[in-house]
């Protein structure tokens, strides 16, 4: 869901950051919301937002100890629909960058979809821990593209350059390293504004800094053992354990 207030709010953020924004008039065909005009090229942007989360409301009303089994298909559909609005835009140039701005939680909203949760949908992240070969050095790091994800899948959002995750606490630009324009988009005026004023998630920069692992391989994402073998070989890992946290309804008495 999205209303005009969301779009105008995002436009005001960008304009206050010194960027030139041109709203795109509504038409009978699919259109993105606006265009960010830069010396590096234009960025077509579609804004989407997450309303109050009925799944979380159901959990809060459930018996004590009930785990949350979260269905992410609606979120993925929302992002794919946003991408199609950009992709099918008749005035889109192949050189245009593409960006989905996703408001994951509004002020006063109730949702489990925090930015960290949404990042898992984009990047297929898993938290891994274990020890390295020989030195037995302990590690705990996130692994990008360990499982199927929006950016990894060529069928979901092909050549989408990035997604902005926006909640009441932070605004992050998540770069897609699988986009054919990744190496250019990461150095654009828009991305540089995010680096200075907000935040940028760039898996390759994080890997170079030793902050994460990346499963850059063609192994089927259903083959977890195959992914683990790849990571062990790439990073000299001895043991690999997946760490997952599941929300439960445990009210404070």
Regions found by a protein language model. Give the residues of each.
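Beta-sheet entry/capping signal
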Residues: 42-43, 99
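A short acidic/basic microdomain associated with nuclease active sites
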Residues: 14-39
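Metal-dependent nuclease catalytic core centered on acidic motifs
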Residues: 1-4, 10-16, 48-253
